[in-house]
């Protein structure tokens, strides 16, 4: 996790890894009405993060963006366990495909 400046940091891995698997848990949601400043700020952050990682997505041999994460916003730290569980379950479903793609 590269935080705000480089949220999908593949550069440290390129010289030492044969294959790179990137995972994004901050998908861009559809624009809906902004009922609060928090909703607006969340949308702006997601758009900024997407623009920030776009170049590095192309460098990933496997790119995973688990579905179902659009219901969570960046400011809901209390949902970290649920977000982890969604990503873990989705990735387990991809294990055979990843093996075929990489080996």
Write out the residue ranges for each language-model feature.
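Patatin-like phospholipase
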Residues: 2-103
């Amino acid at each position: 996790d590269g935080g705000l400046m480089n949220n999908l940091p593949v550069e440290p891995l390129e010289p030492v890894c044969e294959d790179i698997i990137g995972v994004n848990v901050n998908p861009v949601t559809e624009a809906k009405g902004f009922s609060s400043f928090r909703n607006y700020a969340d949308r702006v952050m997601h758009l900024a993060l997407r623009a920030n990682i776009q170049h590095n997505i192309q460098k990933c041999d496997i790119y995973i963006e688990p579905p179902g994460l659009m219901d969570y916003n960046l400011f809901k730290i209390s949902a970290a366990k649920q977000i982890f569980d969604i990503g873990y379950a989705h990735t387990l479903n991809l294990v055979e495909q990843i093996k075929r793609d990489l080996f």
